[in-house]
């Protein structure tokens, strides 16, 4: 269970979910119809040495149903394209909130002069930096790690790292919202808005919005023979308290918002999911992707 002020490294609590995401990105990368190319993801999983995830890399069939890694492929592609679109529109600074083991500063082709800020827990960023250094990786942008808890005063830490609120920004909120208490969730959007000059972009995924966590757990147990995250009960890491609806909040604060469901996104990427049970259709319809421009 989560507690106020809890922290983690890459093989515990929320940090372990980042390792899972890296695993699913690595599995997606080797698919013949891969939607992404993330050759860095495998490095992180192998360096961490967590048995469940290294086992999945060695034998993906242990995952059983591959829909979960396919979902991660679509999600990753969505955010890749978001950054490409935003920088193509002239945005020259990007902020990746809860960056985890995200390697976009290394694997995407950023325009010259782009600064990428990665915000996450200190131990997570330290692990990532060590692995990338061990492999001699070179970032394709001006990468600036910002070691801070998103429940704390992260805007101050971001500005201390050189963030300029007077310039348009591309913000990514990927795989994050469910792990925040309601108050921190709402404060996150307030702070993004306050730090965003006109012309800023934001992309958000909102997993299983409005779904009771006990129901989510029951659906997962019913349709997935193996827990994609091994022994960790991901639902226990989520907060299910009241929070603002991101679409309504952003729209009400002057952002122009576009929304799609995970099923719509999968179909757009040539990954339609046929014949899902009604419960999974409902869950997928509640898993949404947003882009917004200020």
From Swiss-Prot:
SUPFAM superfamilies: S-adenosyl-L-methionine-dependent methyltransferases (SSF53335). One of its GO terms (molecular function) is methyltransferase activity. Coiled coil: none annotated. Its EC number is 2.1.1.-. Keywords: Methyltransferase, S-adenosyl-L-methionine, Transferase. Belongs to the UPF0677 family. This is Putative S-adenosyl-L-methionine-dependent methyltransferase RHA1_ro00605. It comes from Rhodococcus jostii (strain RHA1). The lineage of its organism: Bacteria, Bacillati, Actinomycetota, Actinomycetes, Mycobacteriales.
């Amino acid at each position: 269970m989560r507690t106020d002020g809890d922290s983690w490294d890459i093989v515990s609590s929320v940090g372990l979910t980042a390792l899972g995401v890296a695993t699913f990105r690595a599995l997606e990368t080797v698919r013949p119809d891969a939607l992404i190319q993330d050759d860095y993801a495998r490095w992180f999983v192998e360096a961490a040495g967590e048995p469940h995830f290294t086992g999945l890399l060695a034998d993906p069939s242990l995952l059983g149903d591959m829909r979960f890694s396919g979902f991660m492929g679509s999600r990753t592609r969505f955010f890749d394209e978001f950054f490409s679109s935003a920088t193509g529109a002239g945005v020259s600074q990007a902020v990746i909130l809860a960056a985890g083991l995200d390697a976009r500063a290394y694997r995407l082709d950023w325009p010259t002069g782009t600064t990428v800020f990665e915000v996450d827990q200190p131990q997570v960023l330290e692990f990532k930096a060590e692995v990338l250094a061990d492999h001699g990786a070179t970032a394709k942008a001006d990468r600036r790690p910002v070691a801070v808890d998103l429940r704390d005063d992260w805007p101050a830490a971001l500005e201390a790292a050189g963030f300029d609120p007077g310039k348009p920004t591309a913000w990514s909120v990927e795989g994050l919202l469910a792990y925040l208490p309601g108050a921190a969730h709402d404060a996150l959007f307030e702070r993004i808005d306050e730090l965003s000059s006109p012309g800023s972009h934001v992309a958000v995924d909102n997993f299983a919005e409005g779904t009771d966590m006990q129901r989510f757990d029951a659906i997962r147990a019913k349709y997935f023979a193996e827990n994609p995250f091994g022994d960790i009960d991901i639902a226990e890491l989520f907060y299910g308290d009241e929070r603002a609806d991101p679409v309504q909040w952003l729209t009400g604060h002057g952002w122009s918002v576009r929304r799609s469901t995970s099923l719509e996104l999968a179909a757009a990427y040539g990954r339609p999911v046929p014949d899902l049970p009604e419960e999974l259709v409902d869950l997928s319809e509640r898993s949404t992707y947003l882009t917004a421009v200020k």
